[in-house]
Amino acid sequence: AAKESIATPELAFTISDSGIGGASRNFHKWGRNWKIAHGNVERRILLNSWEGVYMDINEKGMDQMMGDIASMGGELFVMDDGWFGDKYRRVTDNSSLGDWVVDRQKLPHGIGWLVETAEKHGIRFGIWIEPEMTNTKSELYEKHPDWVVKAQNRDLVTGRGGTQLLLDLSNPAVQDFVFGVVDNIMTENPDIAYIKWDANMDISAHGSQYLKNQNHLYIEYHRGLAKVLDRVRAKYPDLTIQACASGGGRANYGIMPW
């Protein structure tokens, strides 16, 4: 539009007299020194619960895994997917995303008990979330079907479990919700040291129920994500955030500042 401006992604380049290896090391040094949050801080040795128990989370198992990693000199335990859901419990991957309340059948004493248990073992505690997502089988989607990325006059495009959907971060209400996911967890449990921020679906449904200009979705989605992450980092500057995204789906310099 007239008089409208847009900031494109930054371009970084390097010169190397040692081939590709030298160029790679240059970028690594630049990333640690200038881009990634806490880039030169020594990272804690951690154990993540996912491959050990998947979604079969319970207090006894988490306590045991914390004790195991502590006994080996580890410093951090991260509880992965499967800890949440009320009306729809997260026992498989086809439900509950967006319903970020503790499953009291699995964890009757809540997250606070796990944080305290980690401290008793002499380690820190971290937690998994996927705040940009929901499922068709969730209380969030039942309340806000207009919050998901969806092309007009087209069926839903679903991801993992056949039910996963992407929330539309171009929508300020969705931005507030996603920030609130992190803020609520951290407000209730301020000693959490680490968040594993997953994102197992990309923008595969090319439409917004919020935007007037549909071709702005990609740009406005990422602007919205940046606004959320700016708010998170401003309020929780010392929190370590892992950009998981099915492993390395967000391993890029653009996400590193947060």
Q: Positions of the model-derived regions?
A:
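Short glycine/proline-rich turn/loop motifs
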Residues: 44-50, 159-164
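Short, well-ordered coil/turn segments that N-cap beta-strands
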Residues: 41-45, 73-75, 121-125, 191-193, ...
